[in-house]
């Protein structure tokens, strides 16, 4: 089957923002105006297409990244209500991502497979903590983006305030290509700075849009921001710069070409405005998506590693060998769905492919594209497509699927570590097996959700990104798997690390039991690594003092020993282990012996290397009426918090601090009682930091007395 839409007319985009900035409503309006749905869905009524899980509709938040395919034809500038005659149709694959920090992995895995992002900002709140997190994630994968300042109809809406915040707090080159006409109740239209025309909304559902002259009172402001736009575009290209110096202006075509080039290269973030809920600005936003965000062929070719370790690029083309990345797993009543982004080649139903990450073959029995929870069967997925495969056996998030005859492993995802744990136990004996199956299914879907068993208490421990994350997962166990469970109090995911390097520490495992014995001997150096690096292993074995087949088992033993540190049994992180020496026995050496020797060496080295306990520090932003700010700051200090700044605007104070997670349990209730219900806060993981000695001693003593949950 031939490609129906050429690759240059495909857009893979995400819609991402802080919670409550209006991402899901923006997505719903995109689906409405592009004709995919014929009735407007509302988050507060629980009728949206992309929020399809029961918990999402109840809570009014997006939890999972929902993928949807729609079509768009550009509007006619002279009659913005209508498509441009003869204009081609574009395919837009959209992923609506969560804004709550507990669901960061959903945003992370979406960013990995997207070509462009619409970053939605609340016109009142502006740049909020999760906006910064989303921005960092987009930076990590170099994703081009456009900014949509939403909710221009809200009390306190201020487009230019958000413009300044994006430039100052996100350090981004935000360039308005629109200005709002009016704000709050008076918001009635948008000035297009590229075409220098006003567009006025004449009806409530945003379908009757009429061009008009720029209002007299806005002419100076429009001239100022048009000049900024022209200058920013000129700086992206030498030829445009010369033209700008010669003529002091650029044509509409020059501006659009320069904006596209600057957006795709990350030099420019075009800024648009509107009110998705009031149906204003969404069609122009869609035009900007096709005008300025990249197609799969505009972005650098995906890089991968061949079986021999050499690097290779796979271009976005149907003619290249097939390669795809699995970015999300989902189970529902129809079976297991694996969402994939096809980077090169064609995937056809009924064929076999290789999961090169696990070196397993997978059969492609069914392929679907999604309209949220509705599935449309297709025969193939081509380069640049987002879709899902049903019934894969061994594939998990971050795995590469590829042509068996052209194996490659694509760069995977960054997966953050869980910071909070709780014990769960089934309410009845009948629930024991069901609990185990439910936890396995949920852990397979969500790589930030971990399941372990405490070796001392034999309790099942679940770990995740925050209290809401675990609450939703426990709720899903009840709804989807019919499992009732008792849930313990939250526990902090402490970690251990070392403060000084130690060299030439031996691990020797010798056992003679009659017949063949066991012999493994390794010598390691252990040193602290950069915070955030986790675990690094380097082998400097030369001359065959340890045969190469015994080095991976030694590394495995070292890695497994890191799972339970020497102070309190918490995982050991941010260390570098170098295998420097060892010996072996021709007859008695085995993989198991070297695995045990590696584990022994690591434990001994960690004891000597000044081990310390680490705790997760959270980035906390509290918004309270000015009158309560003194109490809030005092409370943060009492929680061992470190103040990082404060600002006050319109009688509302924003307090920024870093606070240990251990001190933040129950804060939602405390902040409400301290501020008469008027305080709100957001919290996200920042980094690990050493626990003060007196507190560390108590944690270590408790872990030795009662077992440890990690």
Curated annotation (Swiss-Prot):
Gene3D superfamilies: 3.30.230.10, 3.30.70.240, Elongation Factor G (Translational Gtpase), domain 3 (3.30.70.870), P-loop containing nucleotide triphosphate hydrolases (3.40.50.300), Translation factors (2.40.30.10). One of its GO terms (biological process) is ribosome disassembly. GO terms for cellular component: cytoplasm. GO terms for molecular function: GTP binding; GTPase activity; translation elongation factor activity. It is found in: Cytoplasm. Residues 8-297 form the tr-type G domain. Pfam families: EFG_C (PF00679), EFG_III (PF14492), EFG_IV (PF03764), GTP_EFTU (PF00009), GTP_EFTU_D2 (PF03144). CDD domains: EF-G, EFG_III, EFG_mtEFG1_IV, EFG_mtEFG_C, EFG_mtEFG_II. GTP binds at residues 17-24, 96-100, 150-153. Keywords: Cytoplasm, Elongation factor, GTP-binding, Nucleotide-binding, Protein biosynthesis. Coiled coil: none annotated. Belongs to the TRAFAC class translation factor GTPase superfamily. Classic translation factor GTPase family. EF-G/EF-2 subfamily. HAMAP family: EF_G_EF_2_B. Catalyzes the GTP-dependent ribosomal translocation step during translation elongation. During this step, the ribosome changes from the pre-translocational (PRE) to the post-translocational (POST) state as the newly formed A-site-bound peptidyl-tRNA and P-site-bound deacylated tRNA move to the P and E sites, respectively. Catalyzes the coordinated movement of the two tRNA molecules, the mRNA and conformational changes in the ribosome. This is Elongation factor G. The gene is fusA.
């Amino acid at each position: 089957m031939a490609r129906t839409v050429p690759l240059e007319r495909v857009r893979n985009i995400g819609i991402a923002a802080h919670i409550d900035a209006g991402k899901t409503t923006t997505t719903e309006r995109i689906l409405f105006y592009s004709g995919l749905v014929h009735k407007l869905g509302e988050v507060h009524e629980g009728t949206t297409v992309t929020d399809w899980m029961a918990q999402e509709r109840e809570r009014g938040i997006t939890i999972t990244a929902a993928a949807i395919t729609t079509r768009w034809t550009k509007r006619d500038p002279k009659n913005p209500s209508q498509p441009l005659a003869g204009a081609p149709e574009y395919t837009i694959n959209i992923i609506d991502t969560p804004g709550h920090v507990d669901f960061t992995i959903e945003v992370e895995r979406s960013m990995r497979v997207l070509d462009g992002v619409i970053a939605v900002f609340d016109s009142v709140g502006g740049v909020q903590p999760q906006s910064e997190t989303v921005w960092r994630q987009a930076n990590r994968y170099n994703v081009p983006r456009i900014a949509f300042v939403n909710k221009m109809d809200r009390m306190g809406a201020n487009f230019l305030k958000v413009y300044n915040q994006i430039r100052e707090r996100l350090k981004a080159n935000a360039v308005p290509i629109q200005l709002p006409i009016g704000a709050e109740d008076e918001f009635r239209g948008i000035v297009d700075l590229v075409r220098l025309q006003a567009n006025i909304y004449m009806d409530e559902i945003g379908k009757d849009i009429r061009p008009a002259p720029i209002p007299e009172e806005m002419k100076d402001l429009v001239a100022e921001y048009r000049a900024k736009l022209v200058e920013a575009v000129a700086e992206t290209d030498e030829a445009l710069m010369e033209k700008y110096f010669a003529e002091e202006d650029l044509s509409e075509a020059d501006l659009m070409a320069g904006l596209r080039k600057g957006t795709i290269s990350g030099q420019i973030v075009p800024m648009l405005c509107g009110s998705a809920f009031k149906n204003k600005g969404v069609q122009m936003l869609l035009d900007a998506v096709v005008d300025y965000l990249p197609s799969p062929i505009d972005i650098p070719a995906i890089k991968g590693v061949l079986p021999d370790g050499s690097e290779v690029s796979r271009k976005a083309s149907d003619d290249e060998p097939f390669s795809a990345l699995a970015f999300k797993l989902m189970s529902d009543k129809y079976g297991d769905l694996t969402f994939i982004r096809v980077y090169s080649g064609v995937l056809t139903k009924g064929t076999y492919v290789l999961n090169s990450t696990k070196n397993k073959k997978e059969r492609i029995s069914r392929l679907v594209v999604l309209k949220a929870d509705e599935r449309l069967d297709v025969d193939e997925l081509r380069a640049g497509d987002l879709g899902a495969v049903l019934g894969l056996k061994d594939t998990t998030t971050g795995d590469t699927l590829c042509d068996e005859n052209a194996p490659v492993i694509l760069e995977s995802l960054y997966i953050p570590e869980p910071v909070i744990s709780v014990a769960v136990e089934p309410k009845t004996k009948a629930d024991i097996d069901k609990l185990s199956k439910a936890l396995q299914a949920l852990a397979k879907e969500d790589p930030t959700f971990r399941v372990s068993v405490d070796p001392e208490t034999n309790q099942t421990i679940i770990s995740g990104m925050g209290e809401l994350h675990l609450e939703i997962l426990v709720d899903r166990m009840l709804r989807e798997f019919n499992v009732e469970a008792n849930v313990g109090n939250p526990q902090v995911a402490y970690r251990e690390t070392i403060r000084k390097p130690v060299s030439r520490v031996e691990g020797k495992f010798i056992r003679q039991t009659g017949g063949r014995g066991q012999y493994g001997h390794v010598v390691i150096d252990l040193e602290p690594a950069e915070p955030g690096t986790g675990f690094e292993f380097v082998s400097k074995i030369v001359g065959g003092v340890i045969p190469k087949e015994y080095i991976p088992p030694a590394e495995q033993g070292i890695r497994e020993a890191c799972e339970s540190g020497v102070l309190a049994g918490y995982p050991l992180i941010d260390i570098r282990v170098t295998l420097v020496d060892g010996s072996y026995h021709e007859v008695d050496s085995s993989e198991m012996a070297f695995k045990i020797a590696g584990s022994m060496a690591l434990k001994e080295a960690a004891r000597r290397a000044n081990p310390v306990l680490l705790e997760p520090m959270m980035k906390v932003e509290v918004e309270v009426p000015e009158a309560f700010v003194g109490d809030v700051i005092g409370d943060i200090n009492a929680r061992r918090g470190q103040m990082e700044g404060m600002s006050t605007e319109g009688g509302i104070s924003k307090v920024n601090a870093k606070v240990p997670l251990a001190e933040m349990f129950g804060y939602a209730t405390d902040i409400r009682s301290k501020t008469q219900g008027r305080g709100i806060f957001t919290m996200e993981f920042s980094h690990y930091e050493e626990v003060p000695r007196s507190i560390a001693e108590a944690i270590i003593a408790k872990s030795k007395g009662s077992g440890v949950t990690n």
